[in-house]
């Protein structure tokens, strides 16, 4: 992951790119279908897409498949994976792994020495991915 216009391949035709304001409605729909609580609002997502202290990564194959939101604390050189979601129909295609590669690469580009994340104990799939990635 080296530039704003990068594309990271997962499987098939899945690509990852930086999010844009026009992605916000689709991101909200994914957010609402993925989480029961602590959902981001449309206003919050639009803010994070534009904010210099966050990165939104979007996986797509012509349609939105998933996203990752990373916050950056440059003074402390720490990145925080705040949220990641993959559409139910896209799970098992490497979308989460591709989003994590973009998130980690983007954090490194910004000088982060560490990335932190939280995950529910009941989310075995995410825990397995994070463990494979060294978290």
Describe these PLM feature segments.
Residues 1-11:
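Acyl-donor-binding surface of acyltransferase catalytic domains
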Residues 9, 18-89, 100-102, 106, ...:
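Acetyl-CoA-dependent GNAT
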Residues 14-16:
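Extreme N-terminal starter segment of soluble prokaryotic enzymes
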Residues 88-91, 117-127:
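Conserved beta-strand-loop-alpha-helix junction that forms the acyl-donor binding cleft
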Residues 94:
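Glycine-rich phosphate-binding loop
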Residues 97, 122-135:
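Conserved active-site alpha-helix within GNAT-family acetyltransferase domains
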Residues 113:
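Short acidic/polar active-site loop segments enriched in Thr and Asp
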């Amino acid at each position: 992951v080296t530039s704003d216009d990068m594309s990271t391949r997962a499987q098939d035709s899945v690509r990852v790119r930086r999010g844009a304001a026009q992605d916000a409605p689709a991101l909200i729909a994914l957010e609402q279908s993925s989480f029961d609580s602590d959902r981001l609002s449309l206003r919050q997502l639009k803010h994070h897409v534009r904010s210099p202290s966050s990165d939104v990564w979007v996986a797509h194959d012509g349609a939105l498949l998933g996203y990752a939101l990373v916050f950056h604390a440059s003074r402390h050189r720490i990145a925080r994976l705040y949220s990641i979601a993959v559409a139910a129909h896209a799970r098992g295609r490497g979308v989460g792994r591709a989003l994590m590669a973009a998130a980690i690469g983007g954090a490194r580009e910004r000088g982060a020495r560490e990335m932190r994340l939280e995950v529910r104990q009941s989310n075995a799939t995410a825990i397995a991915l994070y463990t494979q990635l060294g978290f």
